């Protein structure tokens, strides 16, 4: 009979940051007797989850993708945002063979160069500075027909903040004397990640057919009309931008289409609609054979050009477990499943030997403030069963509530989400202690602790750059180390498990066994 394993469990409370100020702080306002008691009585520390400590630009807020890559890698992983900033600054970007090749090919054939992406200074899925550099690259290489298709943010940025970005690009095109913003649409449609194909179809039709629900002469006018309809940036309906006498910007065979998002999860669906011959998410009214370039690799099975292919990470936590014949479980809801699998494994899609995965469906609601507990009860039930099963050496779990409900900007809902999490943590901690296992509770970045923007008075729907908690629950006598960061978590887990830390992991253990 095999011996029951005592698992090392990592619970990631997505969007659960630490903030001393109590105003507009859903985590402080919520009744959290369990987390309060753990913080008071167990070894704990605060760790950095943003900026240079996670490979992002200085003071840049953290995000789930970046957070999980650092958590799993055990070393600071320089993110695409930072890498692209450097490439643009030293002008290597302007010589990227994939980007220049696509532009030159379209230009030489008299075709258009279409640039699409999230027009945002948020830096989570994209950055407008990168899009600006792409416009400049196309113009410098002599492209005449340059069309920008702007997906509007309002989620990683304030809800109504797109106007200054659109103005900047309209001014740029005016200065160049060519090109224009050809369409605007909210990210709710263009960047779905939950197979809501009816949304993606609206964006696809706007791009391929130059057909939308609305039309305006300029991008700013189109945005102002959306605000008048009470649509915030994220939800702006498909709007064609085309003044009298301007050519139609519908996509044609042979055009170049460059997708400037660098984060994969919300880029995949619309990319598949363009690239996959066997695409069946919706019946495409127009199938165009464009020269499609992904800025980064959105998925290994999407067969199209990639401007910046992934650098592979060796000996991530998951791979190291497999090499040491350990069993592991990854478990989360739909919204964060990719994060505890693909991203935690350093961008590797397939599971490692001995790695099981459990996916709990996120509730099908329009926005998560309508169901702030999400699917946490079912997730907890499955997680507790796995802890007690004796099957796993380690378990990685993500609860999405703090982040997904924090993004709605609805304070009361975020408070309910945090209270639901407190009940879940109680169940998990009890289960871990009952089998003699160990538990680390942390977060990948902040969100719910800051629900209103003090500067603008608007709802604060974005992540924060605040530290996150790290708590140890277990029978070892440990002392916490200050000054940690997300990439210290994997080495911390390995040291608590009594395992060797691979040399590729440069993070340091944050709990020292006394």
UniProtKB/Swiss-Prot annotation:
Gene3D superfamilies: Alkaline Phosphatase, subunit A (3.40.720.10), BPG-independent phosphoglycerate mutase, domain B (3.40.1450.10)
Entry cofactors: Mn(2+)
Pathway membership, UniProt: Carbohydrate degradation; glycolysis; pyruvate from D-glyceraldehyde 3-phosphate: step 3/5
GO cellular component terms, A-Z: cytosol
Enzyme class of the recorded protein, top EC level: isomerase
Residue numbers binding Mn(2+) 1: 403, 407, 463
GO biological process: glucose catabolic process; glycolytic process
Residues binding substrate: 125, 155-156, 187, 193, 263-266, 336
DNA damage among keywords: no
Enzymatic reactions: (2R)-2-phosphoglycerate = (2R)-3-phosphoglycerate
A single GO molecular function term of this UniProt record: manganese ion binding
Superkingdom, natural source: Bacteria
Active-site feature positions: 64 (phosphoserine intermediate)
UniProt keyword list: Glycolysis, Isomerase, Manganese, Metal-binding
CDD domains tied to this protein: iPGM
Binding-site residues, Mn(2+) 2: 14, 64, 444-445
SUPFAM superfamilies: 2,3-Bisphosphoglycerate-independent phosphoglycerate mutase, substrate-binding domain, Alkaline phosphatase-like
Cofactor mode of binding and number, as noted: Binds 2 manganese ions per subunit.
A Pfam family reported for this protein in Swiss-Prot or TrEMBL: iPGM_N
UniProt similarity note: Belongs to the BPG-independent phosphoglycerate mutase family.
Subunit field text: Monomer.
Its biological purpose: Catalyzes the interconversion of 2-phosphoglycerate and 3-phosphoglycerate.
Protein's recorded name: 2,3-bisphosphoglycerate-independent phosphoglycerate mutase
Protein encoded by which gene: gpmI
